[in-house]
Curated annotation (Swiss-Prot):
GO BP terms: symbiont-mediated suppression of host NF-kappaB cascade
InterPro entries, per the entry: Orthopox_A49 (IPR009473)
Family membership: Belongs to the poxviridae A49 protein family.
Membrane-spanning ranges: none
Protein's UniProt name: Protein A49
Pfam family, one: Orthopox_A49R
Amino acid sequence: MDEAYYSGNLESVLGYVSDMHTELASISQLVIAKIETIDNDILNKDIVNFIMCRSNLDNPFISFLDTVYTIIDQENYQTELINSLDDNEIIDCIVNKFMSFYKDNLENIVDAIITLKYIMNNPDFKTTYAEVLGSRIADIDIKQVIRKNILQLSNDIRERYL
């Protein structure tokens, strides 16, 4: 898929967009169907593992995050932005992103998770902040926010990126 996106071949790009559109719609429906069966502790652990680049794609919300990450990664702006920050700015970014977890806005929560994933690609930050991330996210219950906002967020992502 990535080669098609970057090749400039219009047919390949249109196929990629169609595939990602379908995947995002499908996984959003699966999240709605399965979210109640996922224990909150397991959901939070899987979110932390996703951030730390160890994804459990059997969890539909993690599959949703992975799909969104793939779509957004094509824009490639996030990596460049993170790489342009110094350590203090990254620490400020981590603190600010954590605030998103305490708001009832799924778009902000997903943005925070994906930004933290980009930051944790740096082994130094992963080593330093892995434990803090795990303990902070363990206290959060986002199932209600997911259930309430997943379809709207999915539509917004498709409109914005595809």
